[in-house]
């Protein structure tokens, strides 16, 4: 059921009514065409808002409807009401439903609003038990001022200086940390008594004065019905489109990028909208369709000038796919109910770069939004619902993330039938197993004797990155350090496909900061 935007005092921003419609011949023209409206696409559009350029954002989806079902665990998880992606395929054949959403704002409409910075060391070579995480062609210092700008844009709450892995910052968080509710504060105190240093997670939610966040149980994994999540749509793109500073074309899937005869520039994009062909002409193109879809677009754009795929003379397009090693971790104290509403406030980085018995990096521990029975029954339909209600009513729910390493054979390809095929073999699992072991020990000491874990598979790809990585050597990278394609004069990439490594924290803030950096340091604005 739809919910009106004109409720008195709601402060809600309805979708704009000034969306682009192609000309009768199916053409749309702009100075800059941004393909994708997720974190990378909407943030680069925001960065270009006062450039004097005609900026067009092209999104394959529409605005996600605001309706009561936004906050229904049954609708969102059991009935998959908002899942609208095509199937992808694993290398050995089986299809899977990827964790992607095609709406204005992309996956940020459903993300948990966790917005951490990468650690300073994450941008250099880091030795792991199973290999080396390679250095980026930029440093943390290059990105730091743009981290500050991104935190301001998305309204991040946090507390600096809580643990030693935290990188230096030139500005404080825009807003103070979201406090723990009593059950999570007890857990934080129990962990601190073990010598650990639990932190307040950096969160992009509108919990400040005048903000609309009600700290509900339906944030992480749900769309926000009150526009209080710092997503790419509400925080960055929608205000610009409503004001006319950026234009938006929805419902349009870009299928190819076409180049001039010499292959040095892209002249136009080809797409489909409501079954009709669309041609998008621009002087500059920014690709931000997500790590898998951006790589697939480059591969689908093969031509005489680029026979192996656009900008793929190095055979690097689609390679080095990373997605994190992640485990869903549920700890239960059957003696004590967890009545927390907004659970996602606590994190641990004590083992990020290692432990006393493990000299290599382990990763990050963070709370999830509060687990509810319908969210579990979607994955475990055979389980009695009464049991699931009891378990989720007595659990704390965490997400454990370890870095996976970039390897050539983990890659995205497009099959002869135009299917997206993901070749993915997990690596660096020894570190992840150690992270699960250390977390289990600490959580049990904190009073939760029952622990259930489930390592995420190929379909859990919300942290995907690395398929069009940046670098200084065109033989081993697709993009230069300003994220322009080595082989093209007028194409940039601002999603996570540019990442050289995955680190071990959520990528959203780094995507946004890098998009702001690209707008500031590249010749995107000045290219003729």
Language-model segments: residues:
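FAD cofactor-binding and catalytic pocket of flavoenzymes
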Residues: 92-99, 117, 136-140, 146, ...
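N-terminal glycine-rich phosphate/pyrophosphate-binding loop and immediately adjacent elements
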Residues: 2-148, 271, 287, 293, ...
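Alpha-helix capping and helix-loop boundary segments enriched in small/acidic/polar residues
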Residues: 211, 224-231, 273, 308, ...
């Amino acid at each position: 059921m739809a919910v009106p935007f004109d409720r008195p005092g709601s402060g809600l921003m309805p979708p704009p009514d000034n969306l682009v419609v192609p000309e009768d011949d199916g053409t749309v023209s702009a100075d800059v065409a941004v393909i994708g409206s997720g974190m990378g696409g909407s943030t680069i559009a925001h960065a270009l808002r006062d450039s004097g350029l005609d900026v067009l954002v092209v999104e394959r989806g529409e605005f996600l409807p605001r309706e009561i079902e936004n906050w229904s665990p049954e609708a969102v998880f059991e009935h998959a009401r908002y899942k609208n992606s095509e199937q992808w395929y694993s290398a050995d054949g089986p299809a899977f439903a990827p964790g992607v959403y095609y709406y204005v704002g992309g996956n940020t409409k459903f993300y948990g609003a966790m917005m951490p910075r990468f650690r300073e060391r994450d941008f250099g070579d880091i030795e792991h038990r199973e290999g080396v995480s390679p250095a980026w062609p930029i440093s943390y210092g290059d990105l730091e001022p743009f981290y500050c700008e991104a935190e301001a844009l998305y309204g991040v709450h946090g507390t600096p200086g809580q643990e030693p892995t935290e990188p230096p910052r030139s500005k404080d968080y825009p807003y103070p940390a979201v406090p723990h509710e009593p059950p999570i504060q007890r857990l934080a105190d129990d962990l601190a008594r073990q010598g650990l240093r639990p932190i307040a997670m950096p969160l992009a939610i509108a919990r400040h004065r005048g903000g609309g966040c009600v700290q509900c149980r339906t944030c992480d994994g749900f769309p926000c019905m009150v526009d209080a999540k710092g997503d790419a749509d509400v925080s960055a793109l929608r205000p610009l489109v409503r004001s006319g500073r950026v234009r938006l074309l929805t419902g349009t899937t870009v299928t190819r990028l076409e180049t001039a005869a010499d292959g040095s520039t892209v002249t136009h994009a080809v797409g489909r909208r409501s079954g009709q062909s669309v041609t998008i002409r621009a002087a500059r193109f920014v690709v931000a369709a997500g790590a898998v879809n951006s790589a697939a677009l480059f591969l689908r754009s093969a031509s005489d000038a680029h026979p192996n795929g656009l900008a793929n003379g190095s055979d690097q397009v689609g390679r080095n796919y990373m997605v994190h090693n992640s485990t869903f971790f549920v700890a239960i104290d059957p003696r004590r109910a967890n009545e927390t509403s907004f659970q996602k406030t606590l994190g641990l980085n004590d083992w990020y770069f290692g432990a006393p018995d493990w000299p290599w990096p382990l990763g990050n521990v963070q709370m999830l939004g509060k687990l509810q029975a319908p969210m579990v029954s979607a994955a475990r339909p055979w389980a009695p619902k009464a049991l699931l209600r009891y378990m989720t009513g007595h659990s704390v729910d965490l997400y454990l993330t370890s870095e996976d390493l970039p390897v050539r054979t983990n890659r995205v390809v497009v099959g002869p039938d135009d299917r997206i095929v993901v070749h993915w073999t997990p690596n660096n699992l020894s570190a992840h197993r150690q992270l699960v072991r250390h977390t289990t020990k600490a959580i049990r000491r904190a009073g939760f004797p029952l622990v259930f874990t489930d390592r995420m598979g190929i379909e859990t790809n919300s942290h995907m990155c690395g398929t069009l990585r940046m670098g200084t050597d065109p033989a081993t990278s697709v993009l230069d350090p300003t994220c322009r394609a080595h082989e093209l004069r007028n194409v940039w990439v601002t999603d996570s496909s540019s990442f050289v490594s995955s680190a071990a924290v959520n990528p959203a803030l780094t995507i946004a900061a890098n998009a702001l950096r690209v707008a500031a340091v590249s010749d995107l604005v000045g290219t003729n």
